Design a protein with these regions (language model features):
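A structural motif corresponding to the C-terminal lobe/cap of the Radical SAM core domain
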Residues: 102-105, 111, 127-152
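A generic structural signal for ordered secondary structure
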Residues: 83, 146, 150, 159-161
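Radical SAM enzyme core and accessory elements
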Residues: 155-165
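Conserved AdoMet/S-adenosylmethionine-binding subsite of the radical SAM
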Residues: 1-121, 127-128
């Protein structure tokens, strides 16, 4: 993230009455994001996996920074939306969604928890770049499976938003 550029852009938007938001995976050190906070109206951030071993296997990094940043941002007073991209066979388990929802419940200032159904449109981008898509052939969850995961998350007592197949 180009922190200085982003900060200046957000500042100018705020000065001109334009609403501001940032979407992040929270993997950067908090100090890189901290300067943006005075200029944000809301944040969107992903929590993909609660299990650190799985998170390392899938993303290549620990989720310790992600979870710590989620807590720090939630306590900053800026309204937030927490999201989980539902990747078939990876992030779409009952255990994972339940664990994330339980964590989200502890965070203040979260407007809602959003389950983002898998979108295979990225496959074409990979092919165009001559790259292998590790998710090739995977499809969005069916309505019933998505609803079941949403119900698991709702059992934590949080507001859950999800899209259809």
């Amino acid at each position: 993230m180009q922190a200085e550029f982003a900060r200046e852009l957000l500042k100018r938007c705020r000065e001109n009455g334009i609403g501001t938001a940032v979407e992040t995976n929270l993997s950067l050190p908090f100090e890189r994001m901290e300067g943006l906070l005075p200029y944000l109206d809301q944040m969107f951030f992903d929590i993909k996996l609660m299990d650190d071993v799985q998170h390392r296997q899938v993303t290549g990094i620990s989720n310790a920074t992600v979870l710590e940043n989620a807590q720090r941002l939630a306590h900053s007073g800026i309204p937030a939306v927490v999201r989980t991209p539902l990747i078939p066979g990876i992030t779409d388990t009952v255990e994972n969604i339940g664990a994330i929802a339980s964590f989200v419940r502890t965070l203040p200032n979260v407007r809602y928890y959003e389950l983002l159904n898998f979108n295979p449109l990225g496959e074409e981008k990979y092919r165009a770049l001559g790259l292998t898509c590790v998710h090739e052939g995977k499809r969005p969850l069916k309505k019933e499976a998505l609803l079941a995961l949403a119900q698991v998350a709702q059992e934590s007592g949080i507001r859950v938003v999800y899209g259809q197949e």
